Amino acid sequence: MGATPRWATLSIALPEENDAWLTAFARGFFRMADQHGIELVGGDTTRGALTLSITVMGEVLPGQALRRDGAQTGDDIWVSGVIGSAALALAYRQGRLFMEQIDAARVLPALYLPTPRVELGIALRGIASSAIDISDGLLADLGHILERSQRGAQLEFAALPTLPVVQSYLHEAVARDCVLAGGDDYELCFTAPSDRGDAVQAVAHSAGVAVTRVGRITAEAGLTLIGADGQPLPYAKTGYDHFAA
């Protein structure tokens, strides 16, 4: 985390030529690339099952990258934006959760048009002690930080930032799993010393992104989820398993 994106490679496999699909894909790809100043420098095309492989490369000065192994005991845990919306939308599309259409319309954009927090990642250099994007689920991705940093965490469920429409479905177990372990949010989960809260808020404001403190790093290994009553909450699912899908 924290690098300035510079270049990308793109490899595509398609079962057959489809000019309309390629035109729409290219429009979206280059819109995002141009937004972040990324040059397409190579790749490949071939016939086969639909496959997209994109690699993005960037630059960051030595010692400034936001890694997973820098969290320290007492650090605050932060999350950018809101989480759970994309996973809730996917659960709706897959028929695992009934939603009113007006509610579904509020979360579907998070699934189809996620926003990478590039500017925030860059702004957090020198402030955050560790960072990761939430692609596999908050519990799983925070778990990667804890594993690499050899620390534990207390996470406050009531503090997790979600849209009001997501909150209205939290009585459903699948919705709670979406917030904790759904993934596809691409928000940032990061840690920072407890005395850098004002600095975190200032750079987030400059980047145009809301951030929320959701817990703290502990010396003891393990991740404890805390309920509104201050008592530990049980959880089973932690996130997407790449080799179980």
What spans do the regions from the language model cover?
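Glycine-rich anion-binding loops of enzyme active sites
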Residues: T4-Q94, R216
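Glycine- and other small-residue-rich loops at beta-strand/loop junctions that grip anionic moieties
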Residues: G43, D69, S80-V82, P109-L113, ...
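Acidic/polar short surface loop at catalytic or gating sites that assists cofactor/ion binding
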Residues: Y92-I102
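Polyanion-binding loop/helix "lid" in catalytic or ligand-binding cores
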Residues: I102-H144
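Hydrophobic side chains in well-ordered alpha-helices
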Residues: A65, L120, A199-V203
